[in-house]
Design a protein with these regions (language model features):
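Conserved RecA-like ASCE ATPase "motif II neighborhood" in helicase/translocase motors
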Residues: 381-427
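Short beta-alpha junctions and helix-cap segments that line functional grooves
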Residues: 139, 335, 369-373, 395-397, ...
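Extracellular/periplasmic ectodomains of large secreted or surface enzymes and adhesion receptors
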Residues: 323, 373-378, 398-399
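Short beta-strand/turn micro-motifs composed of small residues
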Residues: 193-194, 341, 410
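ATP-dependent helicase/translocase motor core
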Residues: 2-336, 345-361, 379-382, 389, ...
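Conserved helicase motor
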Residues: 341-344, 364-374, 388-393
Length: 427
């Protein structure tokens, strides 16, 4: 028999927080949130004391005085400039020291790294009052990592005629995008949730705020499948938001990127965009990485994507993580990852995504010719993007590289993948 669940708004809030705390989160207190800098200062200082006591001493952060205030404003400014993901990944410089704000996920068997990761503080705070101007307005829930906000939530209950659509409207009409917490890059996503569906927005912009579904899909359609053990949406906090999963999103998916756009008059301008994976993208990449790790090389997989489903980012995320995939002996699973496409937009998308990862950008190459492609392969360039037309020219070269292992990501959703060229790639 399906268990009874309190799905009122407050009941859903309590349920999510209870499950997150059971999985290792800390329950934060709304009073620890400093609105002027949009930080949970209590959790931030707890992390710094546990991981970098000398930094705390050098910067005089234990005392509630001018040095601490200067550091908090420095950190707030860096998040404004670089986005929360980059600040978590790379930390900040302040005065004579570098301050780490996050400890990376450990590689298998790395005990020291596992211990360091365990010192991260993932916290969830209920009814967070975020505004100095409208002091009574509160978000249902906010998730922080080491005191830095990463996700906000508005929760609704369909049983009382309040649905995820109402949560979306609340974000669009009642949440001032000028508030520090809601500015672009401050959080990785803002999530509207009820007991049946999840949607998210990466950039709150009033009534034009655009929310995308974050559902599992059901019967080859939208929504979520029935859940005999609880709510349809509990995959969100039981799978996606658990510490290791959210850390993986921060490290390998979410990022603030810069794009060049052209207006109606042909003038180009640069805009910033927060990237966050949709559920099907996350599931696809993780499943392929898992299968590649267990199955080894030499297998084929077909990934079906519909138009507008974010295939370019999915390919880019998969490519950069396949490069880092390790076999049991600790050796790289693949010597190179080759992406085959004839769409310049995809090449641009991959380049932009890859370059956000400093440790990967230097090993990315785009081949303009068969000779360049041959050179990249022989020199061991890790990620190579080429066109379907050029690939057959180096099939003979691959024979000379028989001791190498390659992963091929083939974009097949366009017309040029037909005839002899495609046949050769499918050999």
């Amino acid at each position: 028999m399906k268990p009874m669940t309190d799905t009122s708004e407050k009941g859903l809030e309590a349920l999510i927080v209870r499950d997150l705390v059971a999985s290792g989160y800390v329950q934060g207190h709304a009073t620890d949130y400093h609105r002027d800098v949009a930080l949970d200062v209590t959790q931030l200082l707890a992390f710094l004391r546990a991981t970098q006591p000398k930094v705390v001493e050098t910067l005089n952060l234990d005392a509630d005085g001018i040095p601490r205030t200067q550091f908090l404003h420095r950190l707030q400014g860096e998040i404004t400039k670089r986005g929360v993901v980059d600040v978590l990944r790379k930390g900040v410089g302040h005065g004579p020291v570098h301050v780490d704000l996050y400890k990376l996920l450990p590689t298998p068997g790395n005990v020291a790294a596992a211990e360091a990761f365990g010192k991260n503080i993932f916290s969830v705070t209920r009814q967070l009052r975020y505004s100095n101007d409208e002091s009574q307005r509160a978000l249902d829930m906010v998730i922080f990592i080491n005191g830095l906000p990463v996700l906000t939530f508005e929760l609704k209950n369909s049983l009382t005629k309040q649905t995820v659509a109402d949560a979306v409207v609340q974000y669009q009409t009642d949440r001032n995008p000028g508030e520090l917490l809601f500015q672009l890059g401050r959080c990785i996503a803002h999530m509207a949730v009820d007991d049946a569906e999840v949607r998210f927005c990466t950039h709150l912009n009033g009534k034009t705020s655009w929310f995308l579904p974050f559902n599992q899909g059901w019967n080859s359609g939208a929504g979520n499948p029935p859940n005999p053990h609880g709510l349809k949406t509990d995959y969100l906090w039981k799978q996606v938001l658990v510490k290791e999963s959210l850390a993986n999103i921060i490290e390998n998916y979410a990022q603030l990127v810069e794009e060049e756009e052209e207006d109606a008059n042909g003038r180009k301008r640069k805009t910033r965009k927060q990237i966050f994976p949709r559920y099907h993208q996350l599931r696809t990449v993780r499943a392929l990485l898992r299968r590649s790790r267990t199955d080894g090389v030499g297998k084929r997989y077909l990934i079906q994507h519909s138009a507008g489903s974010g295939k370019s980012n999915t390919i880019a995320w998969l490519a950069h993580q396949l490069v880092e995939l390790k076999a049991d002996a600790g050796q790289a699973q693949f010597d190179s990852v080759i992406v085959i496409t004839d769409r310049r937009a995809l090449d641009t998308q991959i380049a932009r995504t890859i370059k956000a990862y400093d440790h990967v950008a230097s090993i990315y190459g785009h081949s303009e010719s068969a000779e360049e492609l041959r050179t990249f392969l022989r020199r061991g360039k890790k990620i190579i993007v080429t066109t379907v037309q050029k690939f057959p020219f180096i099939l003979d070269e691959l024979g000379d590289l028989g001791d190498k292992k390659f992963a091929l990501l083939i974009d097949e959703a366009h017309s040029s993948q037909g005839g002899k060229t495609t046949a050769k790639m499918h050999l």
